[in-house]
Amino acid sequence: MEAKSTAVKSSVAGTWNVRSMNQGKLEAVKQEMARVNIDILGISELKWTGMGEFNSDDQYIYYCGQESLRRNGVAIMVNKRGRNAVLGCNLKNDRMISVRFQGKPFNITVIQVYAPTSNAEEAEVEQFYEDLQHLLELTPKKDVLFIIRDWNAKVGSQETPEVTGKFSLGIRNEGGQRLIEFCQENALVITNTLFQQHKRRLYTWTSPDGQNRNQIDCVLCSQR
């Protein structure tokens, strides 16, 4: 998809695991997006079928799901200001989607992902990273790249030079190590490990019953 665009100098981005999104929840997400002034919102576990894009009031939604099953699913929702800066999109599959924005001094590509869980078969994990690598290779080298949301990985508090800082939680697991290696191979830094925050702000996942919390989400950015 190609579109006329107007560059933006700054924008606010966010990400949300909606655990499925019907029409009622879509309206709630739109209202929350407007309330906190988010220009670009990545969404995971959308659980819609098919792929496409459409306008909904002041927001524009790009989405990817499976052809017939309501599982996984990702989307990127942009407000009017963000929509005016869109250069194109890549509706890859039910686990990843990208939208490219005109920016100053560099254009920006945002990729929303929903990685396989720790219980997934190794073949599924490898396919995910192969697909993501292909998506990165389609991204112009000069773009500032952001990859956001559900990695289902724990990178832990151990620092890795040029990839992570020291502000993270827990112990690195196998999924976290795989993510670290992917970042090293592609010159990416995990930005949310670089800044000190209160511990309650580090948790990115809460179980449906509210009993368990974890930090499994990461925001990756190209090293500059």
Which functions belong to the PLM regions below?
Residues 1-224:
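A shared catalytic/ligand-binding motif for oxyanion handling
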